[in-house]
């Protein structure tokens, strides 16, 4: 069975002496539970695995019950150590306070119980971790599957990855467009919006949240002002509502609005967002063209290609903790600006020969980036770019 790079990280951490709670976070359907189960199977240590996915949010005692179960088994079996794994931990109200209490109790009583928590709501996880568990945890971030992973595991071509994105559960369905679209809609979009966002956050207009996502996904890779979005949506309220919904969609690993790169933070925040899905399947599920037609249509493929490069970048940015922007000044534009500490990287994604790239020269002149290049037509081959270690660019 294919093992992602995170397999070794998680395995190494669980083999170390008990010191930190390990927290695995990432979007739905990217294989968090699968990789953890692979590790548990290969480790010669007893464990208990629980999921809070269908536990009532108010049932805070549930977390303590899980802990008591592993303590009881450890005592009765004379285990030297045990592992407690809780999936979708953020579903339970005040989970972080309960985890802190139980973890500290184990520490005080010298109980060697290692703890691994998984979750798909980044903000709720990080809020709980920073509020109650500071100094007690380590994060392991998992992104969407890369081109290299989809190629090695499923034998995909680059064009397939650009169009179908990187959801491993959808890979066997790409031969049947209807089944593929149904999987993306029900297992990812519906599940994330209904089970993660709407259950976790009071939303005044749930239908508007879904419309915002659908419009944003269809326009992924393009600039679209919030006012223009308001004009396209029914019962849309105001721009601050839309901005809040975009933030929620970003926190769930579905869709974000990239800000314009500027040294002035106020100008950055006031900029028109460039909409970007975290996985290109979320864009192409709304495409009127099937894969074999889209790949031959130069104009459509150019937009799909740019969105595919962007999806790869924002997913990697979450894992490796760098920022992604776009840049535009009058007629000059650069698709993606990456920033980590004081290093800037400018990237132009060129899916067809017609696209202008003068913006890259202008950006070089103004901001002196560490590196700048074209991906695709007339630059680095897309396959080569999608296979490289992005951290070496900085």
Each language-model region and where it sits:
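N-terminal pre-Walker A segment at the start of P-loop NTPase domains
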Residues: 1-15
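Hydrophobic anchor at the beta1->P-loop junction of P-loop NTPases
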Residues: 24
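Conserved lysine of the Walker
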Residues: 32
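Hydrophobic positions on the alpha1 helix immediately C-terminal to the Walker A/P-loop
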Residues: 35, 39
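Short glycine-rich substrate-engagement loop in P-loop NTPases that contacts/grips substrate
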Residues: 50-79
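Conserved catalytic/switch belt of AAA+ P-loop NTPases
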Residues: 96-117
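Short regulatory helix/loop adjacent to the ATP-binding pocket of P-loop NTPases
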Residues: 123-138, 154-155
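Accessory nucleic acid-recognition modules appended to NTPase machines
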Residues: 177, 181-341
């Amino acid at each position: 069975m294919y093992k992602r790079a995170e397999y070794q990280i998680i395995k190494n951490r669980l083999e170390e002496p008990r010191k930190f709670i390990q927290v695995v976070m990432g979007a739905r359907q990217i294989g968090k539970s699968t990789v953890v189960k692979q590790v548990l199977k290969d480790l010669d240590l007893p464990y208990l695995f629980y999921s809070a996915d269908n536990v009532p949010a108010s049932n805070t005692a549930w977390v303590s019950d899980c802990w008591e179960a592993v303590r009881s088994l450890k005592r009765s079996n004379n285990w030297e150590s045990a592992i407690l794994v809780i999936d979708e931990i953020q579903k339970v109200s005040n989970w972080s306070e309960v985890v802190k209490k139980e973890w500290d109790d184990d520490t005080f009583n010298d109980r060697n119980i290692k703890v691994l928590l998984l979750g798909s709501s980044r903000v709720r996880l990080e809020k709980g971790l920073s509020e109650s568990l500071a100094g007690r945890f380590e994060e392991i971030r998992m992104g969407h599957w890369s081109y290299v992973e989809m190629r090695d595991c499923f034998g995909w071509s680059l064009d397939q990855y650009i169009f179908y994105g990187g959801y491993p559960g959808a890979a066997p369905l790409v031969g049947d467009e209807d089944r593929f679209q149904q999987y993306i809609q029900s297992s990812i979009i519906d599940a994330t919006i209904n089970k993660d966002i709407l259950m976790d956050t009071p939303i005044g207009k749930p239908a508007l949240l879904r419309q915002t996502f659908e419009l944003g996904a269809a326009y992924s890779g393009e600039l679209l002002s919030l006012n223009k979005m308001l004009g396209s949506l029914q019962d849309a309220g105001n721009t601050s509502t839309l901005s809040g919904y975009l933030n929620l969609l970003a926190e769930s690993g579905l869709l974000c609005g990239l800000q314009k790169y500027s040294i002035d933070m106020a100008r950055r925040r006031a900029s028109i967002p460039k909409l970007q899905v975290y996985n290109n399947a979320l864009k192409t599920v709304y495409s009127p063209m099937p894969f074999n037609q889209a790949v031959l249509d130069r104009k459509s493929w150019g937009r799909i290609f740019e969105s595919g490069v962007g999806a790869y970048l924002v997913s990697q940015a979450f894992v490796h903790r760098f920022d992604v922007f776009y840049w535009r000044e009058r007629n000059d534009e650069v698709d993606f600006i990456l920033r980590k500490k004081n290093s800037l990287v400018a990237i132009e994604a060129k899916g067809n020969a017609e696209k202008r790239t003068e913006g890259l020269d202008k950006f070089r002149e103004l901001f002196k980036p560490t590196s700048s290049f074209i991906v695709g037509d007339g630059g680095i081959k897309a396959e080569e770019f999608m296979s490289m270690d992005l951290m070496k660019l900085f």
